[in-house]
Structures are given as C-alpha cells and as structure tokens.
Amino acid sequence: MNNLHRELAPISSAAWSQIEDEVARTFKRLVAGRRVVDVTGPGGADLAGVGTGHEIGIEAPLEGIRARQREVKPLVELRVPFALSRDAIDDVERGAEDSDWQPAKDAALRLAFAEDRAIFDGYGAAQITGIREGASNPLLLLPAETAGYPAVIAKALEELRLQGVDGPYTVLLGSDAYTAVSEANDQGYPVLEHIRRFVSGEIIWAPAIAGGCILSTRGGDFALHLGQDVSIGYLSHDDQSVHLYLQESFTFLMLTSEACVVVRPE
C-alpha cells in the first residue's frame, strides 16, 4: 500500500485502465511546458527539494567562522479532486467502452494548466520563477493583424541570436493566437507555413497561457524537476460516486533568462 490508497477503491483493473488512459491522453494533449524544457525525474513522492548549486550567507555559530547555507528549491504538491459515477465504473465490467470519464479529463486539464502556468508565468507561493516571468529580453507585441506575426517572431529570433542563444528555436502560442495564425492567410499563403520557414523547432499550441513566447530548446536553460509524476489516488466512496484525485509534485528552475522572448497581444 502507498499513500494513493488505490487498492481501497471499488474500481476494477479494467476500469482503472480506462481512467488512466483518459487522464494520460488528456494531460499529454494539453501540457506544453514538458515539450520545451529539460525534464528530470520522476524522483519519487519522497523527493522534497532540489539543490540550486548556490549558497546563502547566514549568521555564524561562533566568531571566526563563516556560515553558508545551501539553497534548495522545495517541491510543490498539486492535487485536483474529482468524482466518478459508480455506474460508469461498474459498466466497464459489463463490457462498456463509452463510460463517462469527463470528470477525470476535467481534472487532467486543470492539472496540466496549473503545471504550465507555473513553468511559464511562475508560482510565487511555491518559489517558482516562470520562463516568461524571468525573461530578460524585451517584450514584443503581437499585432491585431495576424499577417504581422511572422515579422514579430523573426524579430524575437534575432534577439535570441544577438544574446548568443543557439537554437533550435520553438514558438509557443496560446489558444487565441494559435487559432488566429492557423486560420490566417497572407496573400493566399498560410501565415503558419510562413512562420515554419524560419523556425527551426516546433510551433506549439499552449492553451494554458495567453500570448506566447519564442525560446531555445537547445537544453540547459529551463529545468522541470518531477517528484511524483501525475498519479491517480483514492479519497472515499459512497453508493453513488467514487471520489478520486490527480496529484503530482514538482519544482522548476529558470536557468537562463536570455533564452526566451515573450510575446503578448497589443
């Protein structure tokens, strides 16, 4: 037994398999940060912190002694509760392939958005500085007309090169910006294809954020440290519902502030 207490849930192995598949598929489709940062772990539920390699001066215990404390970033644990119908769960044993797992998918969306927003925009309460929050390059504005997006992205790439940041370079765009650029044409030529001509990496849909960013995926600039990866745990049940939760623990290190250019709508 572990602290997820899954063996106490009135859920068959077949139903667990369907629930896990829906959660994994939904989380993977929605999360963007893991596609562009270095991911270390999972190190396990007992991983409590990650050393930054830095020291902080503290008061010495005796005269003539220098005291330094190692800086450690504690992991944050996120939990999203949800409930599933007993009927939906039991129907799997009767051969159902269409049980309603929407509450599990909704929980996966919330967890994916929470992780991505911590990675890109920071999470002060968890001592996390996000990529866009910590970026040192000038902010660029996306014009109202999507035909102007390629010029802005080209300028962002130029800024990265001027800062000595090598590629490959990847573009992340929030839902509104990604949809707009996907549907747009410039004199009959798709704007998205125009951007792809000079971006060496991917153009990624990042629904958790507004605006977007252009960054290097060369490695060594951004680090996500996982303790417990996304897991499903059991809380309680009654004659109608089974109460479960999604849980993960992580911290994020912003290592190179010049490796990202933030873009926002005008």
Region spans (language model):
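Extended, solvent-exposed, turn-rich assembly/linker loops in the middle of proteins
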Residues: R132-H194
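Alpha-helical scaffold segments that mediate packing/assembly in large oligomeric complexes
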Residues: D90-K155
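Long, hydrophobic/aromatic-enriched structural stretches that serve as scaffold segments
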Residues: T52-D98
